[in-house]
Amino acid sequence: MGKVAAKIKVMPDSPDIDLDELQERLEQSLPEGAKINGFERDDVAFGLVALLPTVIVPDDAGGTEAVEESFGDVTGVESVAVENVGRI
């Protein structure tokens, strides 16, 4: 079984949120078997900055669903969307 790399767009619920703290909370929320392989930041609008972690997950049933759910439950997260997925 291989692995999948997914770039996930995480929108904070406020432009005033501390992105470093949010990044730490996202890392702590990862389900077993998943790991983050770097973060990017994307200026969206009006001071709002999205986090774009690249997450490595096993290539099995469910794919990135567990990660998306975990990220969605993190305090300060407005929305979560998979931007790009590829096998590695």
Swiss-Prot record:
Belongs to the EF-1-beta/EF-1-delta family. Keywords: Elongation factor, Protein biosynthesis. It comes from the Archaea. GO terms for molecular function: translation elongation factor activity. It comes from Haloquadratum walsbyi (strain DSM 16790 / HBSQ001). The lineage of its organism: Archaea, Methanobacteriati, Methanobacteriota, Stenosarchaea group, Halobacteria. Promotes the exchange of GDP for GTP in EF-1-alpha/GDP, thus allowing the regeneration of EF-1-alpha/GTP that could then be used to form the ternary complex EF-1-alpha/GTP/AAtRNA. PANTHER family: ELONGATION FACTOR 1-BETA (PTHR39647:SF1). SMART domains: EF1_GNE (SM00888). InterPro entries: eEF-1beta-like_sf, EF1B_bsu/dsu_GNE, Transl_elong_EF1B/ribsomal_bS6, Transl_elong_EF1B_B_arc. This is Elongation factor 1-beta. Pfam families: EF1_GNE.
